[in-house]
C-alpha cells in the first residue's frame, strides 16, 4: 500500500479486521509506503532491518504481530495445531531482533507471563488470543497517552528551569536520532517535549519572558535518523529547525551562546538551553542507553556547564540541561548499571555505504542506490547505541508528573 500523502502515523492496526501495517522508514523522507506485517517473522525482519524503529514503536509492532499471527492461525482449518510452547519459542525469537531496547523485551515478556497459567502442551485458542489482543491494544493506547504526558511534564520542567535561571528571550533545543511519532504510537518522547514546548512557547503566544525559537536535530550517523526522520516530522509540524552534522555540536553551541559571535548562515542566535534525547533502556542508577552519539552530547553539555566559559557575562546562556525523555516502560530496574547493558552492533556496510534515491536536477526521485563512501574491506566498529552515565544527565522525564532529578549525592531514585 502506498500513498503520496505525508503522514506521521508509523503504525496502522485495524482493530476490526486484525491487519497490521507499518510505515517503511527506510524510504523516508522521499517516499511514503506501508508494508504489511502478517506474522512474527515479518515483524522480526522489519525490526531487524529498522523499517520500524524507536523503542516504544518496536514493542508495539512486536505485540501486534503476535496478535496477527495468532488470529491468522485461528482462522486456519488445517490440523497443524500450535501449542503454548510454540508461541513462547516465537516470542523468545522476536526478542532477539533488537536486544538493547528494553521495551520490546518487556512487552513480549508480559505476553509470556499471560501464558504461564497454561500448560506448554495446551493448544492456543480464542481465550488466549483475546488476552493477547487486549494486552496489545492497551499497550498502544497507554503509550499514546503517556507520550502526551511526557510532553506536558517536559514543558513544565523547561518553564521551571528557565524561570529559576531568570532567563529571558529566545532559546533553542538540540536533539538526536528520532523520538517523535515515527518512533512511538504518536506524539513522541523527546520530540514530544519539543512539540509540546513549541505549541506553548512560541514568540507570539508565550506567557513567559522566553520562547522556543529553534530546533537543532543532529544528523545521527550512520543511519541518519535525524536527517531523514526528525526533519520530516519537524517540517510536517512547521517547527523552525536547522539540520546539523553530529560533529558540529560544540561549535554551534559556542557560537549561539556568545553575543559577540554571529552565526554564519543562521538567521537567529538563540542559545541552546536544552539537549533532549530519548532512551532505549534506562537502568536502576539512571545510566541510559540511547542512539550512538548521545553520550557525546552529554559530555559537550557538561563541558559548557563546568568550563571556564561560565565566568563570562554570557554564563547563563551556556547553562545546558541534558534531559532524557522516555516512558516508564523503558526503565529497567533489574539492571544495576550501564555496564550491564548489551549493546547491539550493526553491520559494517551501514557505515561504509549510503543508501538513498537518485535525485535529478529538478529534485525528482528516481531509483534507490547504494553508494560506497569508505575503503573496501576495512575494519569497522558500528555500535547502534552508547551509554550515557547518570552523572551527565540532569533529569529523566516520564509520564509521571514527578520529574526524576538527582539527590544531593548525585544519584537518581527511579523506583516506579
UniProtKB/Swiss-Prot annotation:
Per its UniProt record, what Pfam families does this chain match?
IF-2B
Catalytic residues per the record? 280
What general EC class does the enzyme of this chain belong to?
Answer: isomerase
Instruction: Give the EC number(s) under which this enzyme is classified.
Output: 5.3.1.23
Q: Which reaction does it catalyse?
A: 5-(methylsulfanyl)-alpha-D-ribose 1-phosphate = 5-(methylsulfanyl)-D-ribulose 1-phosphate
Q: What Gene Ontology cellular component terms go with this record?
A: cytoplasm; nucleus
Residues carrying the site annotation Transition state stabilizer: 177
Q: Where's it found, cell-wise? A: Cytoplasm; Nucleus
Q: Which GO terms describe its molecular function?
A: S-methyl-5-thioribose-1-phosphate isomerase activity
Q: Which NCBIfam families match?
A: eIF-2B_rel (TIGR00524), PRK05720.1 (NF004326), salvage_mtnA (TIGR00512)
The protein here is known as Methylthioribose-1-phosphate isomerase
Q: Which organism is it from?
A: Candida albicans (strain SC5314 / ATCC MYA-2876) (Yeast)
Lineage, highest ranks first: Eukaryota, Fungi, Dikarya, Ascomycota, Saccharomycotina
Amino acid at each position: 500500500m502506498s500513498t503520496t500523502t505525508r503522514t506521521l502515523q508509523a503504525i496502522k492496526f485495524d482493530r476490526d479486521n486484525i491487519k497490521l501495517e507499518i510505515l517503511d522508514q527506510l524510504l523516508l523522507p522521499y517516499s511514503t509506503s506501508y508494508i504489511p506485517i502478517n506474522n512474527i517473522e515479518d515483524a522480526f525482519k522489519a525490526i531487524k532491518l529498522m523499517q520500524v524503529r524507536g523503542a516504544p514503536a518496536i514493542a508495539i509492532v512486536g505485540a501486534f504481530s503476535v496478535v496477527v499471527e495468532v488470529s491468522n492461525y485461528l482462522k486456519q482449518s488445517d490440523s497443524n495445531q500450535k501449542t503454548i510452547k510454540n508461541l513462547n519459542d516465537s516470542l523468545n525469537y522476536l526478542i532477539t531482533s533488537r536486544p538493547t531496547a528494553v521495551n520490546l523485551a518487556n512487552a513480549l515478556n508480559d505476553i509470556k507471563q499471560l501464558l504461564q497459567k497454561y500448560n506448554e502442551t495446551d493448544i492456543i485458542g480464542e481465550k488466549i488470543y483475546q488476552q493477547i489482543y487486549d494486552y496489545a491494544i492497551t499497550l498502544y493506547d497507554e503509550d499514546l497517552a503517556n507520550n502526551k504526558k511526557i510532553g506536558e511534564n517536559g514543558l513544565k520542567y523547561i518553564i521551571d528551569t528557565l524561570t529559576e535561571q531568570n532567563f529571558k528571550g529566545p532559546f533553542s533545543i538540540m536533539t538526536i536520532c528520532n523520538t517523535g511519532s515515527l518512533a512511538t504510537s504518536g506524539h513522541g518522547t523527546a520530540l514530544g517535549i519539543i512539540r509540546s514546548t513549541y505549541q506553548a512557547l512560541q514568540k507570539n503566544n508565550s506567557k513567559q519572558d522566553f520562547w522556543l525559537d529553534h530546533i537543532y536535530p543532529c544528523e545521527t550517523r550512520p543511519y541518519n535518523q535525524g536527517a531523514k526522520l526528525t526533519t520530516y516530522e519537524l517540517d510536517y509540524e512547521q517547527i523552525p529547525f536547522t539540520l546539523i552534522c553530529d560533529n558540529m555540536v560544540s561549535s554551534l553551541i559556542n557560537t549561539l551562546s556568545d553575543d559577540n559571535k554571529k552565526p554564519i548562515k543562521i538567521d537567529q542566535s538563540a542559545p541552546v538551553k536544552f539537549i533532549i534525547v530519548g532512551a532505549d533502556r534506562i537502568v536502576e542508577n539512571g545510566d541510559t542507553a540511547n542512539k550512538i552519539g548521545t553520550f557525546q552530547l552529554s559530555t559537550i553539555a557538561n563541558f559548557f556547564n563546568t568550563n571556564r566559559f561560565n565566568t563570562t557575562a554570557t554564563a547563563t546562556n551556556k547553562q545546558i540541561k541534558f534531559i532524557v525523555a522516555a516512558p516508564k516502560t523503558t526503565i529497567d530496574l533489574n539492571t544495576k548499571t550501564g555496564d550491564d547493558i548489551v549493546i547491539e552492533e550493526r553491520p559494517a556496510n551501514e557505515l561504509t555505504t549510503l543508501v538513498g534515491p537518485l535525485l535529478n536536477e529538478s529534485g525528482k526521485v528516481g531509483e534507490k542506490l547504494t553508494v560506497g563512501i569508505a575503503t573496501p574491506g576495512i575494519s569497522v566498529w558500528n555500535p547502534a547505541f552508547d551509554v550515557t552515565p547518570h552523572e551527565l544527565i540532569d533529569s529523566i522525564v516520564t509520564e509521571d508528573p514527578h520529574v526524576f532529578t538527582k539527590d544531593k549525592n548525585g544519584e537518581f531514585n527511579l523506583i516506579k
